[in-house]
């Protein structure tokens, strides 16, 4: 019999089922709208979800990188992506998918390239590499600017990345909306009781909707399955690491972890064998 997950008071919003429930449903549209307004510093009259767009290319990749796509009725299109595992080219991925959102606006025939703005928000469970020109803090904002004088070339494309897991401030140390949002995104699952939000309406509503018991039975079951899958995957990864170390193969640790990462990205067993040099039986054992 499958062991049930003991629910916490609040769900983990970085798990895809919970994230979509909190920010990707009509019921909680106000939470996404408030997030986008505060992050991109602009008033949004209303948003419309675009469920026809799927960022992830495979089931495996969507479990690690999932998205909410929406359009504002009077302004930009938004891509909100949540990445729970480090990815080497995540910044480039953001540029690629925002570019796709732009080209999808092109009509058949003549076009003057007057496209709607596309804003990308990435919530990530890791730190961006220093190579992307990071500033201090855990909220990184990028736009297209002149290299010499930083004059804005166009406001039609913007990228904001919010580092959830590396965020280490207490609530009292938070000085703005973005930091408070990161605080709750990271710490929600650890709260046994409702924390003091200092009467902040947005976070009062976020906490209310993030209660596990607030979910319907079907969503609770989906959430529990995802928690179990993530725990199982973590255990497999740890087992592969310990087994390789026990056998005295440091190189084996790296290869096993690389193989696991490729499998989780949706790569076939044959592709993983070719890229890592591991035998097929070893790769299949990691996949099961």
List where the protein language model places each region.
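Conserved single-residue anchors adjacent to enzymatic active/cofactor-binding motifs
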Residues: 1-220
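Short, charged alpha-helical interaction segments and adjacent helix-coil junctions
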Residues: 2-8, 78-83, 183-288
């Amino acid at each position: 019999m499958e062991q049930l997950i003991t629910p916490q008071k609040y769900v983990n919003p970085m798990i895809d089922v919970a994230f979509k429930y909190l920010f990707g449903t009509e019921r909680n549209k106000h939470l996404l709208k408030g997030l986008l307004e505060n992050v991109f510093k602009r008033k949004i009259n209303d948003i419309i979800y675009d469920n026809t767009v799927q960022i992830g290319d495979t089931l495996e990749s969507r479990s690690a990188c999932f998205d909410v796509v929406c359009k504002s009725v009077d302004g930009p299109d938004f891509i909100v992506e949540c990445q729970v595992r480090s990815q080497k080219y995540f910044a480039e991925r953001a540029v690629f998918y925002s570019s796709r959102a732009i080209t999808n606006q092109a009509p058949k025939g003549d076009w003057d390239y007057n496209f709607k703005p596309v804003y990308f928000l990435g919530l990530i469970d890791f730190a961006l590499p220093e190579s992307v020109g990071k500033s201090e803090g855990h909220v990184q904002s990028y736009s297209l600017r002149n290299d010499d004088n930083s004059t804005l070339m166009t406001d039609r494309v913007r990228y904001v990345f919010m580092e959830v897991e590396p965020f280490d401030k207490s609530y009292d140390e938070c000085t703005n909306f973005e930091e408070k949002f990161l605080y709750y995104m990271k710490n929600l699952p650890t709260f046994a009781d409702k924390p003091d939000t200092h009467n902040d309406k947005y976070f009062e509503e976020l906490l209310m909707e993030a209660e596990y018991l607030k979910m319907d039975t079907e969503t609770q079951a989906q959430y529990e399955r995802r928690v179990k899958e993530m725990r199982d995957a973590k255990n497999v990864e740890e087992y592969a690491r310990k087994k390789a170390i026990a056998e005295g193969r440091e190189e084996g640790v790296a290869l096993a972890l690389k193989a696991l990462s490729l499998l989780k990205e949706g790569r076939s067993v044959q592709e993983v064998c070719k890229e890592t040099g591991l035998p097929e039986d070893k790769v299949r054992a990691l996949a099961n």
